[in-house]
């Protein structure tokens, strides 16, 4: 029976009961009100008491004033030289260089005006008067005009390298010209009809030296002259002055001809062969 009544009450969704439930929920619980009755009137406006706050602040801030509470961090910036910190020294150096090269710093350093004072003395009794003139030079123009690039000093020593090369070149050219001249002279002599002074030959593979000088004999006569067998009776076969009765190109025949002339058989018919 109790179970059935409980189920009926649970399934009853009438409005008056809901209102009663709402009233019960809206009423504050008794235990909460009892707890609040123990508080002072000042506690309803502030969360913390001012007297207790000072004690808490002193206790909480005690560790801030104590310097020994924190461990000391050892740094070597002031002890070691700047070589052990290349990054910081490099950054500082670059910063100083940029500051020196910046146009703002140049304008600041060169913004001062130069004052020149000229004194003009007069010969009268009034003495001398000084006139001060203030001239402000333009900063950018003074920086640009005042800068002068260092010029390299020219050496005063004589530069004979090119001259020597020119002399050698001209000497080589002159030597080549002389060789050409000698070759042209020999060619001109052949063209003009050089002849052997002994046999009168005009064509020969090589001109040789003779009693009159170099290149005065043909090849055959020059060989005979060098060996000491050049006689008036000797004539090459191709010589234009060759005569079979008086001349020969064989040394043995020339010796026989001379024996006949010495015996007296051909004294009347002998002619000068020289």
UniProtKB/Swiss-Prot annotation:
Span(s) of short sequence motif Nuclear localization signal: 152-159
Gene3D superfamilies (alphabetical): Erythroid Transcription Factor GATA-1, subunit A
Top-level division of the source organism's lineage: Eukaryota
Any one GO cellular component localisation term in the record: nucleus
Molecular functions (GO terms): DNA-binding transcription factor activity; transcription cis-regulatory region binding; zinc ion binding
Cellular localization per UniProt: Nucleus
Tissues expressed in: Mostly expressed in roots. Also expressed in stems, flowers and leaves.
GO terms of biological process kind: circadian rhythm
Statement: the UniProt record of this protein carries the keyword Transcription regulation: yes
Pfam families, sorted: GATA
SUPFAM superfamilies: Glucocorticoid receptor-like (DNA-binding domain)
Zinc finger (GATA-type): 190-244
Chain positions covered by the region annotation Disordered: 1-39, 102-132
Entry keyword set: Activator, DNA-binding, Metal-binding, Nucleus, Transcription, Transcription regulation, Zinc, Zinc-finger
Family classification: Belongs to the type IV zinc-finger family. Class A subfamily.
PANTHER family noted in UniProt: GATA TRANSCRIPTION FACTOR, GATA TRANSCRIPTION FACTOR 1
Entry function: Transcriptional activator that specifically binds 5'-GATA-3' or 5'-GAT-3' motifs within gene promoters. May be involved in the regulation of some light-responsive genes.
The protein, known as: GATA transcription factor 1
Species whose genome carries this gene: Arabidopsis thaliana
